[in-house]
Amino acid sequence: MSSITRDSQPALRAGVRLQHDRTRDQWVLLAPERVVELDEIALVVAQRYDGTRSLAQIAQELAAEFDADAADIEADVIELTATLQQKRLLRL
């Protein structure tokens, strides 16, 4: 497994997609034989996993959008990314 840094450029793995589950009224990551529910914060991060933006860039965008501390946002983004990578939902 690749190590995650602020320069990592994650994207959803093949076969994983972001979708709104109408039954649950919840955004989820759908993967073969599993569903991962996303809270509002995880959703705005996951929407930016495009394989071109670094985690530092994603954190800067979110810090500007939500008027929050960039260092705190970056730490949270890296933590979420690590969790999703451990679940094999992302490629770096």
Curated annotation (Swiss-Prot):
Gene3D superfamilies: Coenzyme PQQ synthesis protein D (PqqD)
Kinase as UniProt keyword: no
Pfam families for the chain: PqqD
Keyword Metal-binding part of the UniProt annotation: no
Coiled-coil spans in chain: none
Example of a GO MF term: quinone binding
A biological process term (GO) from this entry: pyrroloquinoline quinone biosynthetic process
Keywords associated with the record: PQQ biosynthesis
The protein's annotated pathway: Cofactor biosynthesis; pyrroloquinoline quinone biosynthesis
Highest taxon above the source species: Bacteria
Family the entry assigns: Belongs to the PqqD family.
Assembly and binders: Monomer. Interacts with PqqE.
Function: Functions as a PqqA binding protein and presents PqqA to PqqE, in the pyrroloquinoline quinone (PQQ) biosynthetic pathway.
Name of the protein in question: PqqA binding protein
Organism: Xanthomonas oryzae pv. oryzae (strain KACC10331 / KXO85)
Gene: pqqD
